[in-house]
């Protein structure tokens, strides 16, 4: 992703999944929440400071896998982010508390469909298209590694359609649809 043409380290941010330190290790256990895209993010120091050399990728990978940042530090207690002001994170909080009595933020995993975006914005169609294939493969790998019981996408069909088709081998099963007021949710068994 960091080698996509037109990417400027001072103008783009890269997302890596967040996994709580108490995320279940058993197969088919835990919850993986998926958002649309980065929309601004704090990056490991090597993203902005490393020289543009072959070693950049390894420095970034080392920062990601040696990070001790959890959802609690990254989202809930971030000095420049209002967790309580985010309907997105309040919904994740409420759903997680249905499964876990306390400390939900240490027991879930979070990722995005698209991993690369301009700071403070979601990727435009061009940037989405440049990264779509690799992001679909990354999402499948995240699901494989984390082996969650539930994968909950807060994305809408427009954003998730190609990803769902990819994860389902090119043919979507009929979803279970639930409506409440003007809202609806769709559940797929994949």
Residue spans of the language-model regions?
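Charged, glycine-enriched surface loops/patches
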Residues: 82-99, 163-190
């Amino acid at each position: 992703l960091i080698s996509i043409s037109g990417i400027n380290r001072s103008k783009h941010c890269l997302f890596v999944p967040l996994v709580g330190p108490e995320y279940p290790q058993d197969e088919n256990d835990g919850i993986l929440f998926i958002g649309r895209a980065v929309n601004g993010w704090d990056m490991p120091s090597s993203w902005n400071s490393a020289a543009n050399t072959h070693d950049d990728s390894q420095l970034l990978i080392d920062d990601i896998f040696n990070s001790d940042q959890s959802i609690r530090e990254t989202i809930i207690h971030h000095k420049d982010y209002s967790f309580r002001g985010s309907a997105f994170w309040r919904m994740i909080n409420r759903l997680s508390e249905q499964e876990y009595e306390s400390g939900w933020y240490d027991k879930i995993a979070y990722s995005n469909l698209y991993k690369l975006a301009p700071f403070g914005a979601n990727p435009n169609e061009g940037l989405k298209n440049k990264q779509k294939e690799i992001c679909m493969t990354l999402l499948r790998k995240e699901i494989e590694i984390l082996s969650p019981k539930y994968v909950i996408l807060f994305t809408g069909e427009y954003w998730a359609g190609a990803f769902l088709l990819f994860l389902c081998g090119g043919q979507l099963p009929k979803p279970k649809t639930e409506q409440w007021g003007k809202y609806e949710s769709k559940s797929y068994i994949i």
